[in-house]
Amino acid sequence: NIVLTQSPASLAVSLGQRATISCRASESVDSYGNSFMHWYQQKPGQPPKLLIYLASNLESGVPARFSGSGSRTDFTLTIDPVEADDAATYYCQQNNEDPLTFGAGTKLELK
C-alpha cells in the first residue's frame, strides 16, 4: 500500500496569512502524465469536501485561495490568504494504486 505522510499534524495560522501543508507518498503516484493526488477539507460532522484533484486542479466552486502543487512523491496544499472558514482538517489522498489511501490529516486552527 502507498503510505501518505502529512506534515505538520497541526498548525495555527493568523487570518490573512499563508498555510502550507505537505504530503509525501512512499512511492510515486504519477501515471499517464498525471499525478493521482487529491486534497480534501473536512469539518466536524461533515463529509470530506474535495478541494484539489490531480495535484493542482481546483474543484469547481472552491476559492482560488486554495492551490496544489507537486508530482511523483511530494505534494503541497497552500491556502493563501487563510480565512476564518478554513479552520478544518485537511487530507491528502492517492488513487494511483489500489487500495486508495489517505494521509493522517492536518488540523488547521486560526490564531
Curated annotation (Swiss-Prot):
Residues 54-60 are annotated as: Complementarity-determining-2. Residues 39-53 are annotated as: Framework-2. SMART domains: IG, IGv. This is Ig kappa chain V-III region PC 4050. Residues 1-23 are annotated as: Framework-1. The keyword Disulfide bond applies. Disulfide bonds join C23-C92. It comes from the Eukaryota. InterPro entries: Ig-like_dom, Ig-like_dom_sf, Ig-like_fold, Ig_sub, Ig_V-set, IgV_Light_Chain. Residues 102-111 are annotated as: Framework-4. Gene3D superfamilies: Immunoglobulins. It comes from Mus musculus (Mouse). Keywords: Adaptive immunity, Disulfide bond, Immunity, Immunoglobulin. Residues 24-38 are annotated as: Complementarity-determining-1. GO terms for biological process: adaptive immune response; immune response. GO terms for cellular component: immunoglobulin complex. Residues 93-101 are annotated as: Complementarity-determining-3. Residues 61-92 are annotated as: Framework-3.
